[in-house]
């Protein structure tokens, strides 16, 4: 260290160790990588009460509630992840939590592990409940379709009028309009197909 650095930072000797001002100044050394609590709060996810207030404001918006529930669940999983990381940051032998939708496995014992798994199970049950409600909503589409003006028979009549017939080869339809089209010369493919169809008979 050069002389300027020595003059800026106070030195600790055994007589000054009980002085709280010197200890406080030493703990605020800016060259260290340790982050202050205010800096860490920007990196942490939003508190849960903020998410619930935000959800209440989104009730009248166009965002479906299943998306909001999914966002809450992902927040709960992130919160669980950060709390597990904080508890095992001292060593890598701390409890780790592996979560799946149908089953939850925990290696090691942790009091927060049960709370985390129960909150995640609740989130998955909310999302499953919403998807079941959505599928029930689509079952009514069958009745709406039958009441519409375009039924299956109507669509078939539009696509294939009563006077037109489809050949067995299903390449083109034959109708009364073919007499008008007979004046036009058939394409080479049509001539080829007609020639071989007569040979096969």
From Swiss-Prot:
A motif (Nuclear localization sequence (NLS)) lies at residues 32-35. It is found in: Nucleus; Cytoplasm. One of its GO terms (biological process) is response to far red light. InterPro entries: FHY1. GO terms for molecular function: protein homodimerization activity. It comes from the Eukaryota. Disruption phenotype: Partially blind to far-red (FR). Impaired inhibition of hypocotyl elongation and cotyledons expansion under continuous FR light conditions. In plants lacking FHY1 and FHL, altered phototropism (e.g. phototropic bending) associated with abnormal consitutive cytosolic localization of PHYA. In the double mutant fhl fhy1 several PHYA-dependent phototropic responses are altered (e.g. Inactivated by rapid reversible PHYA-mediated phosphorylation. Its main location: nucleus. Induction: Activated by FHY3/FAR1 under far-red light (FR); HY5 prevents this activation. Down-regulated by FR, red (R) and blue (B) lights. Keywords: Cytoplasm, Nucleus, Phosphoprotein, Transcription, Transcription regulation. A motif (Nuclear export sequence (NES)) lies at residues 43-46. One of its GO terms (cellular component) is nuclear speck. Homodimer and heterodimer with FHY1. Interacts with PHYA, especially upon far-red (FR) light illumination. Binds to LAF1 and HFR1. Belongs to the FHY1 protein family. Can activate transcription. Essential for light-regulated PHYA nuclear accumulation and subsequent PHYA phototropic signaling processes. PHYA-specific signal transducer in response to continuous FR lights. Mediates the association of PHYA with HFR1 and LAF1 in the nucleus in response to FR conditions. Contributes to inhibition of hypocotyl elongation in continuous blue light (B). This is Protein FAR-RED-ELONGATED HYPOCOTYL 1-LIKE.
């Amino acid at each position: 260290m050069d002389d300027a650095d020595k003059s800026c930072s106070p030195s600790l000797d055994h007589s000054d160790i009980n002085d709280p001002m010197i200890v406080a100044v030493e703990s605020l050394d800016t060259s260290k990588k340790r982050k202050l609590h205010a800096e860490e709060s920007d990196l942490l996810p939003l508190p849960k009460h903020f998410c619930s207030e935000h959800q209440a404001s989104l009730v009248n918006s166009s965002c479906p509630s299943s998306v909001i529930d999914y966002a809450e669940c992902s927040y709960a999983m992130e919160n669980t992840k950060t709390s597990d990381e904080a508890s095992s940051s001292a060593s890598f032998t701390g409890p780790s939590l592996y979560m799946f939708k149908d089953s939850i496995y925990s290696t090691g014992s942790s009091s927060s592990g049960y709370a985390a798994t129960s909150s995640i199970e609740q989130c998955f049950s909310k999302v499953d409940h919403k998807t079941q409600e959505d599928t029930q909503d689509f079952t009514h589409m069958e009745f709406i379709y039958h009441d519409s003006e375009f039924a299956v028979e109507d669509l078939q009549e539009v696509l294939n009028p009563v006077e037109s017939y489809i050949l067995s080869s299903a390449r083109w339809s034959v109708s009364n309009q073919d007499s008008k089209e007979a004046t036009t010369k058939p394409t080479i493919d049509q001539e080829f197909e007609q020639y071989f169809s007569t040979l096969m008979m």
